[in-house]
Amino acid sequence: APLILQVSKGARAYANHTYLVKLVEAAVIECPNIPIALHLDHGPDFETCKSCIDGGFTSVMIDASSKPFAENIEITKKVVEYAHDHGVVVEAELGALAGIEDDVKVSAEESHYTHPEEVQEFVEKTGCDSLAIAIGTSHGAYKFTAAQCTRNEKGELVPPPLRFDILDEVVKRLPGFPIVLHGSSSVPQEFVRMVNEFGGKMPDAVGIPEEQLRKAARSAVCKINIDSDLRLAMTGTIRKFMAEHPDKFDPREY
């Protein structure tokens, strides 16, 4: 299946841009039959997007969703024009997700759903290739407070349902257009339990139910971001291995 390798601004600074690009170029050589995209997540400004475009990324996201609507259009259009001139595709965002992811920090009070009546104008004026919308997902492993959730018979938190009415209205206004959901990790409870069992402390970590993600994927959603799930799986597995094999110190063994 095609593969999108997504890099945030923070990950790019941590791992080094050149190393990342060359690793992906090596993956393309080693796996010639798999289409691979190197994508910038939540590019905060034109300069960051331009640096990634010039440096070998094949896809970028410009996130000006915190700006007023007209300014979001202006910034996004500038990135789109430069990216398209260089054969790079652009994801944009309307609406603001709550939660924390690297430099992206949005409180519940600052978050807001996407307004469907804005999407057609935004896409037409910017020329973006895909659009991230806000329908109730949230960044991080702590997507919802206990007050926002109910509890099932096991006492586990059950998050509020996504706003599929908003998604449906967006799809009506943008038929066939690629839609993106950020903050959509399901936060598998087996990994949360694994982290907690082996020395971690992640009470009430809860994600988006997978059946809701499958429903979104059957609609126009073509990209679902699940970074927290990858972190949980890796962290839980490493914690478990180190607890069960305290004599081991070679990272190649875990």
Predicted feature residues:
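C-terminal alpha-helical cap/extension of soluble enzyme domains
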Residues: E197, I208-Y254
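Short catalytic/ligand-gating loop segments at beta-alpha or beta-beta junctions
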Residues: L181-S186
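Short secondary-structure junction/hinge motifs that connect adjacent elements
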Residues: V7-A13, P251-Y254
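Alpha/beta enzyme core
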Residues: A1-A11, T18-I34, H42-P178, Q189-M194, ...
